[in-house]
Amino acid sequence: MSIDRTQPLLPVTPVQPRETSDIAQQTRKPSAQSKTPVSGTEVKLSDAQAKLMQPGSQDINVERVETLKQAIRSGQLTMDTGKIADALLKNVADDLKNS
């Protein structure tokens, strides 16, 4: 295969922009639900779901995050790259076994 015999590239034809307001007006249909008032719907959450919805329940240890941020800023954060690599390799090996 010769490099000199390649076909010349043709210019791409430009795409004409559409008017988004015209498209939105054409596709928008009046909804019957928007005209009628919505009847009351009652939702009952389980205790576990209610606990998760409370603002005090966090799955992030904020104190640990702040400690790590300060260690990074001060340059005192040490990482065991060998341990990270071993865990990564173990994870990949487990994934390959399960595939």
From Swiss-Prot:
Residues 1-42 are annotated as: Disordered. The keyword Cell inner membrane does not apply. Residues 22-39 have a biased composition (Polar residues). Keywords: Bacterial flagellum biogenesis, Repressor, Transcription, Transcription regulation. One of its GO terms (biological process) is negative regulation of DNA-templated transcription. Responsible for the coupling of flagellin expression to flagellar assembly by preventing expression of the flagellin genes when a component of the middle class of proteins is defective. It negatively regulates flagellar genes by inhibiting the activity of FliA by directly binding to FliA. This is Negative regulator of flagellin synthesis. It comes from Yersinia enterocolitica serotype O:8 / biotype 1B (strain NCTC 13174 / 8081).
